[in-house]
Amino acid sequence: MSAEKISISLPKELYRELEDFIIRKGIPDRSKIFQIALRNYLDENRDGNEIIYGIINLVYDHEEASEALTEIQHEYNDSIISTLHLHVSEKICIEAIAVKGEKRKLVELNNKLGQIRGILKARLLISFPYEKT
């Protein structure tokens, strides 16, 4: 893989925090941390009509949210690839919804899910499939 070298400036406190993290985790390559962080930042800030993949992570009270959750999932079934459902307790569930579609539509789906009564957490993790060069 060809690479470009760049130089960056960090506030001292952020630099110290980074160095402490690298030592604690035994990370041999500082560049890899920046590559991952930059890809994540770029993914989160892509245009709204690009096709992306993602996971919507939900934590919810199934007694309050299940019916509305199912309705919205059926409304967006063209964007939903798969779901994984976990029972955490008698009341609380976690759901991971794998999605693909235009970013703006997936953000809209995540926002709608987050408005359902009983949803405690709704978070869209965006992934853009990078080709290794």
From Swiss-Prot:
One of its GO terms (molecular function) is DNA binding. Signal peptide: none annotated. Its cofactor is Ni(2+). Ni(2+) binds at H74, H85, H87, C93. Binds 1 nickel ion per subunit. CDD domains: RHH_NikR_HicB-like. One of its GO terms (biological process) is response to nickel cation. Keywords: DNA-binding, Metal-binding, Nickel, Transcription, Transcription regulation. Transcriptional regulator. HAMAP family: NikR. Belongs to the transcriptional regulatory CopG/NikR family. This is Putative nickel-responsive regulator. It comes from Saccharolobus solfataricus (strain ATCC 35092 / DSM 1617 / JCM 11322 / P2) (Sulfolobus solfataricus). The lineage of its organism: Archaea, Thermoproteota, Thermoprotei, Sulfolobales, Sulfolobaceae.
